[in-house]
Every structure is written in structure tokens, then in C-alpha cells.
């Protein structure tokens, strides 16, 4: 199915052609088209053009208007103010364009693939081995997953990377404990479902961590053996590596159980942790030192920046290799840049990482550019995100002041949502199985939407009462909008959705139709700027237009002519398909009945 040009892009082209025809001296002028309250669109470009040509803007506007093709797209065009063009489109053009979108059998609603698709390596969802995931891990996972879905929909080749924390001195302590307590990682009972297996894995890892830490802090001989074990691990001792792999594998069971709850796909080949770059660290440091990008300072290998200074005014370096010979995080991150550009052929590197790490990544990117690993043809972007706050506006903690476990947060969201679904279940006729399933979809959707409807860089308050509210800017409001349309379509009987371009549209129908047509342009903007909150805003506005449409336009009224019923069914069905597709791109499910 060929892509469908939006009404705005078609009008933009017609106006640009008219500008060229009427004012050949203007060159390639931009009409500066935008949506307007005065008409469907307003073009403001003539004002600047008149200054350039030293002409009367209203007279120039009249010349451009005369050069526009008659009929078809434009119903009315009015010159207002100092040469603004207020353009109203024909109802036929709106319905015919929407009909072309509805006819797209590939489920893309006529949205084109982008012309300049490349390869993006996106680094997101980065938990730590042998440690529980907490609320701080939520945003990278949710934002990253949505960006992956959106980029892939636009045609980008996306390579996912989960840079898990799977290396470090703490593994000496854990592995040494396992050597001295061989059964420490065994679970009680047999295998269960993914969630219970994950819970058992984390429970075991927690116990081993606490017991090994207690021994490490109290027993000097065990501490010495643990430090020797770190040396053996870093030297690649096979027996030590085998036990290290057990901790990684046990942690992956837990990771997958949490991501399954989040309704996210995490694939093992995409999990490339810190250890995945160990073989590159020495070469990375050697190249940096040989090229003069990094220099020795007090025994450490450092990269300095004139604009990065501490409170004392001295330059603060990026430490690539420590005085004791150990490698800093920067060495791993720089090795990852080399791998992703040279081996994975990325032309965009995208890091979905906490805003508090912005300075680190700015220094890493600049170092990589100095070393020639990031050329002018490769873009490196940190998609920085803010903090999850509690209702009190402070970082989200338990009542005891502890960090909130991510699983507990998700479980509570599902419980709250299930109660909301159950309240409506009898009226809709939901089975217990549907109540449980919808509760999961609504709860997880509420958590994701609260995050994604906020600009990533901003902090946001985690308020479950607000998240599962049936009204306002929430995912459940959008899910109910979708389910209501599906209910109308089931009740339509013999009437079928069908476009009728010959009909005159009511104001609410026009507003809904014009908004539906913007879907592709919104996705293009969201994909370019990595801003899923703009897609969330578009979907909320779509649901709001739908509510106005219901208030002003009866769909299945017996007073309506058959063609009016069919046309309105067509509009709501296309709205449902757009909601379904848009929510799926945010990683949120849309139940058929709710």
C-alpha cells in the first residue's frame, strides 16, 4: 500500500507552487503553514516575503490566491490581517484522504516510511546483576521501549542494547561465597511460572548478597580470599568465570520476569553488559594514550576538558584508567562506542540514561570524537530523563525511606486497576479471566502512560490514584475510548463502516477527521526528536475530539440516513485503529471490552 500524503503536506505543496507561480522572484518560499482556529489552516509566509520583495502583503496574498488550483482540496481561502491566508478544506478532500488511510491493508494507516532510514543503536533498560530492580529503573525501560517501537515503525533499523552491570569487585565476594557454600544459589521447590521463578531467583540472590556481605565485613580472611577472587575473575580463570556466569544467568531469570510484567520484550542477544567489552579495554586505553587524547595524571589515564572544572577551578578529568590499573566506567563506555559504530555500523547512538549522568556522557562523546571513533556522520544523543517523585514531590521512597521495588510498584498498579475494571465488569459482562487480564493491561498501561505523557527530561509524580482515573489525561481514558468504539461497532448490526465523501460534515466530524490525518506527521516528529510524550498528547487530543464528536453527532441514531450512519461508523472505526496503533507504539494494550 502506498503511503498517503497528509492534507497539510498536500496543501503546503499547492501553496508553495502558487507562491512560485505568482511571485517568481521569491524563489523557493515557505508558506509557513499551521493549524488555525480561524480556519483549518493558516499560511503566514507572505508577510516575510512582502518585506523581502518590498510589496504590499495583502496584494501579494491575493496574487497567490489567484494562482491556487480551483476545486478539489480547497473550499475557501480568505486573506486576513497583513496578508495571512486562512484556508478551509473541502469535506470531500478530508473524507477521501481518510478513506485512503483506512484502505491501507498493512496496518500503517497510510503513514510513510522515512526516506533517510539508518541504523540506531539504543542503550536502555540497564539493571545490575545480583541486585533488585527499583523505581529508578522504570523510566529507562519504558521510554526506551517506546522509542524502539516508534523508530522501527518509521523504518529505522534499530539495534537494542541492554548495558547491564555485570562486572566489578563485588563479584569477588559473591563468587568466593559460592565456592565456600556450593548450594547457595539453589532454589527451594521446582520451577514455576516466569514471575515466581523470577521472585525465587531474586530472593536467592538477595540472601547470597547479604550473607556474603556480612562475612566480608566481619571476616578478614574471607575478605582477602574475595579480593584474590577478583584478580582471578579479571584474569579469566575458567572456574571463576563459570561461577560468575551462574550469577548472571540467575539474574537474567529475574530480569525477564520483571520485564514480562512490564509487557516488554527483552532478548538475550541484546543483553551486552559491561563484561562484553572487557577484551577491548586495553586497546581503547592504548589508542587514547598514543594519540594524545588521554594523558597520565597522578598515575591515572585521563582526558581533560577546558570547560569542565571543579569548585576549586581545576579541570575535572574523565578517568579512563585508574591509578591502580583498574578500568573506569569511561573505558567501557568508550569501547562500547567503538563496537557500536565500527561493528554494528550505527549512524546514531542513543542512550536512555538518567539526566544526572549527562556530564559523564558529554565527556565520553567528546572523547570519542577526539579519538575519531565518532565521525561527523555519526550522531550520539543522550535521551536524558528526570526522577520519579512521590506525591510529596520528593524522590519516590517507601514509608521506611527505602527505595521502592519495581515489582511491588507494578503489582500495586495492577491491583488498583483491577478494582477499577471490576467496578464496571458487570455492566459490560466481563468474565473473571477478562477482569484479571484487563486489570493487568490497565495497570501496566497506567504506569507507562504516566511516564510517557511527561517530557522525558522532566521529573514526574507517581500517583496511582490519578493514573487509574477514568477521566483526564490517563491511559485508561484512552483505553475506554477504544473499547467504547468497539462496543458501538458490535451494536451496529447490518450497518457497516463506509466513507461517504459526498456528505457534508458536521463541525465535530471535521475536527475529528483533521486530527486523524495528522497521525503520520506526529509520528515523524516524535521519531526525529525522540519525544514519545508528543504521541501521548496526540492520542489524548484524539480521544477528546472523539468525546466531542459523541456529544454532537449520534452514530447509530434511527433518525440518521443510512449513509450518515455508515460515514460516522467509518470515522469511529478509523479512530479506533489510530488509537490502537498509537497506544501499541507506546507499549500499551487496548482491550476490546472494558
UniProtKB/Swiss-Prot annotation:
Coiled coil feature spans: none
A single GO molecular function term of this UniProt record: ATP binding
Keywords: Aminoacyl-tRNA synthetase, ATP-binding, Cytoplasm, Ligase, Nucleotide-binding, Protein biosynthesis
GO cellular component, one term: cytoplasm
Entry's transmembrane regions: none
Domain of life: Bacteria
Residue span of motif 'HIGH' region: 127-137
Gene3D superfamilies to which the protein is assigned, alphabetical: Arginyl tRNA synthetase N-terminal domain, HUPs, Isoleucyl-tRNA Synthetase, Domain 1
Location of the protein in the cell: Cytoplasm
InterPro entries assigned to the protein according to its UniProt record, in alphabetical order: aa-tRNA-synth_I_CS, Arg-tRNA-ligase, Arg-tRNA-synth_N, Arg-tRNA-synth_N_sf, ArgRS_core, DALR_anticod-bd, Rossmann-like_a/b/a_fold, tRNAsynth_Ia_anticodon-bd
EC number: 6.1.1.19
Reaction(s) the record says it catalyses: tRNA(Arg) + L-arginine + ATP = L-arginyl-tRNA(Arg) + AMP + diphosphate
Pfam families attached to this UniProt entry: Arg_tRNA_synt_N, DALR_1, tRNA-synt_1d
GO biological processes: arginyl-tRNA aminoacylation
Record family assignment: Belongs to the class-I aminoacyl-tRNA synthetase family.
Classification via HAMAP family: Arg_tRNA_synth (MF_00123)
Assembly mode: Monomer.
PANTHER family linked to this entry: ARGININE--TRNA LIGASE, CYTOPLASMIC (PTHR11956:SF5), ARGINYL-TRNA SYNTHETASE (PTHR11956)
Protein name: Arginine--tRNA ligase
Amino acid at each position: 500500500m502506498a503511503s498517503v500524503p497528509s492534507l497539510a503536506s498536500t496543501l503546503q505543496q499547492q501553496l508553495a507552487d502558487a507562491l512560485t507561480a505568482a511571485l517568481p522572484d521569491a524563489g523557493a518560499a515557505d508558506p509557513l503553514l499551521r493549524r488555525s482556529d480561524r480556519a483549518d489552516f493558516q499560511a503566514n509566509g507572505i508577510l516575510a516575503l512582502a518585506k523581502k520583495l518590498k510589496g504590499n502583503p495583502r496584494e501579494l496574498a491575493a496574487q497567490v490566491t489567484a494562482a491556487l488550483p480551483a476545486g478539489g482540496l480547497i473550499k475557501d481561502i480568505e486573506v486576513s490581517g497583513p496578508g495571512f491566508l486562512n484556508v478551509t478544506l473541502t469535506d470531500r478532500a478530508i473524507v477521501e484522504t481518510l478513506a485512503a488511510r483506512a484502505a491501507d491493508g498493512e496496518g500503517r494507516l497510510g503513514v510513510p516510511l522515512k526516506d533517510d532510514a539508518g541504523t540506531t543503536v539504543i542503550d536502555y533498560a540497564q539493571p545490575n546483576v545480583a541486585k533488585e530492580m527499583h523505581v529508578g529503573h522504570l523510566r529507562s525501560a519504558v521510554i526506551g521501549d517506546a522509542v524502539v517501537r516508534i523508530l522501527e515503525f518509521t523504518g529505522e533499523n534499530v539495534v537494542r542494547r541492554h548495558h547491564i552491570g555485570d562486572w566489578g569487585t563485588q563479584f569477588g565476594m559473591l563468587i568466593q561465597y559460592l565456592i565456600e557454600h556450593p548450594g547457595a544459589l539453589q532454589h527451594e521447590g521446582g520451577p514455576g511460572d516466569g514471575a515466581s521463578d523470577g521472585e525465587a531467583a531474586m530472593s536467592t540472590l538477595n540472601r547470597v548478597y547479604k550473607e556474603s556481605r556480612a562475612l566480608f565485613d566481619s571476616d578478614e580472611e574471607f575478605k582477602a580470599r574475595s579480593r584474590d577472587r577478583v584478580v582471578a575473575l579479571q584474569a579469566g580463570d575458567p572456574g571463576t568465570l563459570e561461577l560468575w556466569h551462574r550469577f548472571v544467568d540467575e539474574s537474567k531469570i529475574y530480569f525477564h520476569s520483571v520485564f514480562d510484567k512490564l509487557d516488554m520484550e527483552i532478548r538475550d542477544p541484546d543483553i551486552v553488559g559491561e563484561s562484553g567489552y572487557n577484551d577491548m579495554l586495553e586497546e581503547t586505553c592504548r589508542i587514547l594514550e598514543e594519540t594524545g587524547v588521554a594523558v597520565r595524571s597522578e598515575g591515572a589515564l585521563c582526558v581533560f576538558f577546558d570547560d569542565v572544572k571543579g569548585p576549586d577551578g581545576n579541570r575535572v578529568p574523565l578517568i579512563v584508567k585508574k591509578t591502580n590499573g583498574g578500568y573506569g566506567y569511561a573505558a567501557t563506555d568508550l569501547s562500547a562506542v567503538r563496537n557500536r559504530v565500527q561493528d554494528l555500523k550505527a549512524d546514531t547512538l542513543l542512550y536512555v540514561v538518567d539526566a544526572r549522568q549527562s556530564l559523564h556522557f558529554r565527556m565520553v562523546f567528546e572523547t570519542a570524537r577526539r579519538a575519531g571513533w565518532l565521525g561527523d556522520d555519526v550522531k550520539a544523543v543522550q535521551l536524558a530523563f528526570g526522577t520519579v517523585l512521590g506525591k510529596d514531590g520528593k524522590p519516590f521512597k517507601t514509608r521506611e525511606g527505602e527505595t521502592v521495588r519495581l515489582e511491588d510498584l507494578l503489582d500495586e498498579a495492577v491491583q488498583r486497576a483491577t478494582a477499577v475494571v471490576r467496578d464496571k465488569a458487570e455492566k459490560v459482562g466481563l468474565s473473571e479471566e477478562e477482569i484479571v487480564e484487563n486489570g493487568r493491561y490497565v495497570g501496566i498501561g497506567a504506569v507507562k502512560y504516566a511516564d510517557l505523557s511527561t517530557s522525558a527530561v522532566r521529573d514526574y509524580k507517581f500517583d496511582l490514584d490519578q493514573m487509574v482515573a477514568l477521566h483526564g489525561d490517563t491511559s485508561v481514558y484512552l483505553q475506554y475510548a477504544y473499547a467504547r468504539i468497539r462496543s458501538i461497532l458490535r451494536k451496529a448490526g447490518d450497518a457497516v463502516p463506509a466513507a461517504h465523501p459526498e456528505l457534508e460534515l458536521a463541525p465535530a466530524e471535521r475536527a475529528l477527521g483533521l486530527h486523524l490525518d495528522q497521525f503520520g506527521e506526529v509520528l515523524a516528529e516524535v521519531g526525529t526528536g525522540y519525544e514519545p510524550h508528543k504521541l501521548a498528547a496526540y492520542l489524548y487530543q484524539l480521544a477528546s475530539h472523539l468525546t466531542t464528536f459523541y456529544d454532537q453527532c449520534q452514530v447509530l441514531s434511527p433518525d440518521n440516513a443510512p449513509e450518515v450512519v455508515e460515514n460516522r461508523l467509518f470515522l469511529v472505526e478509523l479512530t479506533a485503529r489510530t488509537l490502537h496503533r498509537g497506544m501499541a507504539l507506546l507499549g500499551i494494550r487496548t482491550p476490546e471490552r472494558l
